[in-house]
Structure formats: structure tokens, C-alpha cells
From Swiss-Prot:
Classification via Pfam families: Nanovirus_coat
Protein name: Capsid protein
InterPro entries from the UniProt entry: Nanovirus_coat (IPR006753)
Biased composition (Basic residues): 9-20
GO CC list: T=1 icosahedral viral capsid
Keywords tagged on the record: Capsid protein, T=1 icosahedral capsid protein, Virion
The UniProt record lists the keyword Protein transport: no
Disulfide bridge positions per record: none
Gene coding for it: DNA-S
Annotated localization: Virion
Native species: Milk vetch dwarf virus (isolate 9)
Family indicated by similarity: Belongs to the nanoviridae capsid protein family.
Region span, Disordered: 1-23
Length: 172
């Protein structure tokens, strides 16, 4: 006996005119927005910047983000970074995150959730700067709307220059 149950657990009827219906996923148009930023980071300081589409985009939902960061620093130094989602804007980075480990402080745990994290360590000959970079592709699940905020937060052990580029995949 042939079963009429499909993979989703729903029973489908078959009619003589039309066979079993094919499940389909609705495709929503996606726009790609590239944003380029550069900044100077100070030693032993927690800093961050918001990841959002530039321009006159009023209503959107971010589904994916591709983050590329290039750092120029002396050998033997460390940069920690995390990518967080927040329900409200973050004004004071030092009040929200601990200094070397970038953990969320207890007073902000109900509004900030960590999505991804990582670190960059430099190696090379003493006396010369080396350039390091990292790429991070972040899938945001159901997405982040324009009322929520997405940040990249960094802690560095030495003053350095950062070039941050992100490509945001948004649904309008």
C-alpha cells in the first residue's frame, strides 16, 4: 500500500487532474549593499561600529552579512572581535562589554546577544608591521529588521588602523 504522507508530515490528496502538489519556497528579492569604513583603534579600548545598509533604505530585513576586516599591526599583538545583535543602540562600549574578553556585562545581558566571535593574532619579524585580515560570513536566521541593531565590537592590545568592509544582503 502506498502512503500519502510526505516529508513534512502533512497528508496530501491526489486528484486525477493534478498530481501531488510540489512544495516550494517563496523567493524574496535580495539586494546587496557594500559599505566601506576605516578607523583608528586605541590601545586597550573597546570600540564598535554598527553594521547596517547605507543610504536611504527605510525598511529592510538583513538576512546575511559578509564582513571583511583588514588590520595593520606590529607582531605579537592581539585583536578580539565579536558580532552582536542588540534591541537598542549601544552608546557606551566600555559599559556594555568587558575589556580583554569582550563578554557582555550583566547589566546589558537582556538586550545584547552574541552572534559570532573570533580573534586575530599577528606574527612576524620585530620592528616591522604586518597586515592581517579576516572574513566572516554570518547567516542571521529570521533576519534583523531596521528596529534592531547589528554591531561588530573590537578590543585591541595596541593602537592600529582598521579597514572594515561589509556586504549586507537585505530584503526590502
Amino acid at each position: 500500500m502506498v502512503s500519502n504522507w510526505n516529508r513534512n508530515g502533512m497528508k496530501r490528496r491526489r486528484t486525477p487532474r493534478r498530481g501531488y502538489g510540489r512544495p516550494y519556497k517563496p523567493v524574496v528579492p535580495i539586494t546587496r549593499v557594500v559599505v566601506h569604513q576605516s578607523a583608528l583603534l586605541k590601545k586597550d579600548e573597546v570600540v564598535g561600529c554598527e553594521i547596517k545598509p547605507d543610504g536611504d533604505v527605510a525598511r529592510y530585513k538583513m538576512r546575511k552579512v559578509m564582513l571583511t576586516c583588514t588590520l595593520r599591526m606590529p607582531p605579537g599583538e592581539l585583536v578580539n572581535y565579536i558580532i552582536v545583535k542588540s534591541s537598542s543602540p549601544i552608546a557606551n562600549w566600555a559599559a556594555a562589554f568587558t575589556a580583554p574578553a569582550l563578554l557582555v556585562k550583566e547589566s546589558c545581558q537582556d538586550m545584547i546577544s552574541i552572534i559570532a566571535k573570533g580573534k586575530v593574532e599577528s606574527n612576524g619579524v620585530a620592528g616591522t608591521d604586518c597586515t592581517k585580515s579576516f572574513n566572516k560570513f554570518i547567516r542571521l536566521g529570521a533576519g534583523i529588521s531596521q528596529t534592531q541593531h547589528l554591531y561588530v565590537v573590537m578590543y585591541t592590545s595596541v593602537a592600529l588602523k582598521v579597514v572594515l568592509e561589509h556586504r549586507v544582503y537585505i530584503e526590502l
